[in-house]
Amino acid sequence: MVQMKKCTTKEDVLEAVKERDVKFIRTQFTDTLGIIKSWAIPAEQLEEAFENGVMFDGSSIQGFTRIEESDMKLALDPSTFRILPWRPATGAVARILGDVYLPDGNPFKGDPRYVLKTAIKEAEKMGFSMNVGPELEFFLFKLDANGNPTTELTDQGGYFDFAPLDRAQDVRRDIDYALEHMGFQIEASHHEVAPSQHEIDFRFGDVLCTADNVVTFKYVVKSIAYHKGYYASFMPKPLFGVNGSGMHSNQSLFKDGKNVFYDPDTPTKLSQDAMYYIGGLLKHIREFTAVTNPVVNSYKRLVPGYEAPVYISWSAQNRSSLIRIPATRGNGTRIELRCPDPACNPYLAFALMLRAGLEGIKNKIDPGEPTNVNIFHLSDKEREERGIRSLPADLKEAIDEMKGSKFVKEALGEHVFSHYLCAKEMEWDEYKAVVHPWELSRYLSML
């Protein structure tokens, strides 16, 4: 499978469509919650779509507009054009992302990609560019006879296991091939800690490209898995008693080609700006946990005992901390935020991480001393004495923190902020009204 030539202009895309016999192009964007929205246009309509955009009804999209002001258009981004390698080569199908605009030609402020681009502009004003390297984990489950997803395991493998314990290595290989064909640089692919859990790591990149890649990654993983008879789930905690799936986010700032976080003259080899960036993340993380960990199920992962963070602290190597500093230095110096999960909208999550870090640098926010002990072994009193706070315990607590946050409101903009909170409050209200199997198991026979 040969990696396709990267397109940067409309002309590049039109030439590739002709050379590769592409018949349909799936135009895509995400709603406020990060769910992909897509519709196909025939290749003959592509040039006009580049010229005039693709019109759609925004009132039918989560978090967009009311029915009386619903006309919107998608402006295609040629740099995101990719041919889908699992589709037939003859009469091929491609995918392209875009930016959402209003009919008057102004960007739609409710577009998650716009929110991230606005944060990027703030960084550029300070002379910075942001790189991100996410680590996405997922489960592969069996399908039932009707092709619907189950939670039936595909194997009993563990961390770094291989065949026969890892029964999905061929599926991962096919996913790797497809991603590489679509321009990803795959760095590692392996079985994770939990049964049927997997991780595929791709090389870091600039923050907008990486957010696009997260959207593409989930789309590719789900598509290939389904073609192979599996269901790929990015649900944070689909199974009780085993590790959940995270999206650890490694991040760094660059200026004039140099890593801003690296300083060879300090004991930790971390710059003062790196420390302030950490301080900004620690200060604001509770306010935007509802975005990095966006669903009710997210908080079943953020509990002690399963390698997920619970407490707000930082450390050089301590994996019980929220923020870890991997050992690599030089241009590889980075900060790893460990709470995000793959259910998040990457555009919004990365925008908030960047904004929080920038505010830390602007306001010289001190992160305090690193916590180099296992935080889970500390008593409540010891954590209190060290000033270690906890992440929100559930989605309701996260929503309440976000509602009172001037920082998050300014970072997301009024439209996204209000629509996102409305959607999350509805989700929580629906959840709390449902009678869960645990309640029946616990109480039915005794009460």
From Swiss-Prot:
Q: Where in the cell is it found?
A: Cytoplasm
> GS catalytic domain location, by residue?
112-447
- SUPFAM superfamilies to which the protein is assigned, alphabetical: Glutamine synthetase, N-terminal domain, Glutamine synthetase/guanido kinase
List of residues binding ATP: 187, 252, 319, 324
Q: Which residues bind Mg(2+) 1?
A: 135, 248, 336
GO BP term, example: glutamine biosynthetic process
| Entry-linked Gene3D superfamilies | Glutamine synthetase, N-terminal domain (3.10.20.70), Glutamine synthetase/guanido kinase, catalytic domain (3.30.590.10)
What's a Pfam family this protein contains? Gln-synt_N
Cite the GS beta-grasp domain residue spans from the record. Answer: 20-105
The activity regulation comment is: Directly stimulated by the effector molecule 2-oxoglutarate. Inhibited by GlnK1. 2-oxoglutarate antagonizes the inhibitory effects of GlnK1, but does not prevent GlnK1/GlnA1 complex formation.
Query: What is one cellular component GO term in this UniProt entry?
Result: cytoplasm
Catalyses which reaction(s): L-glutamate + NH4(+) + ATP = L-glutamine + ADP + phosphate + H(+)
This entry's comment on the bound cofactor is: Binds 2 Mg(2+) ions per subunit.
**Residues reported in the UniProt entry to bind Mg(2+) 2:** 137, 192, 199
- State the InterPro entries in the record: Gln_synt_N (IPR008147), Gln_synt_N_sf (IPR036651), Gln_synth/guanido_kin_cat_dom (IPR014746), Gln_synth_cat_dom (IPR008146), Gln_synth_gly_rich_site (IPR027303), Gln_synth_I (IPR004809), Gln_synth_N_conserv_site (IPR027302)
Stated EC number for the protein is 6.3.1.2
Q: Which UniProt keywords apply?
A: ATP-binding, Cytoplasm, Ligase, Magnesium, Metal-binding, Nucleotide-binding
Gene Ontology molecular function: any one: glutamine synthetase activity
Q: Which residues bind L-glutamate?
A: 243-244, 301, 307, 319, 338
Record's superkingdom?
Archaea
- Cofactor(s) the record lists: Mg(2+)
Oligomeric state and interaction partners are given as: Homohexamer. Interacts and forms stable complexes with the regulatory protein GlnK1.
User: What does the sequence similarity comment in the record state about its family?
Assistant: Belongs to the glutamine synthetase family.
What does the UniProt record say this protein does?
Answer: Probably involved in nitrogen metabolism via ammonium assimilation. Catalyzes the ATP-dependent biosynthesis of glutamine from glutamate and ammonia.
Q: Which NCBIfam families match?
A: GlnA
Protein name per its UniProtKB record: Glutamine synthetase
Supply the source organism for this entry.
Methanosarcina mazei (strain ATCC BAA-159 / DSM 3647 / Goe1 / Go1 / JCM 11833 / OCM 88)
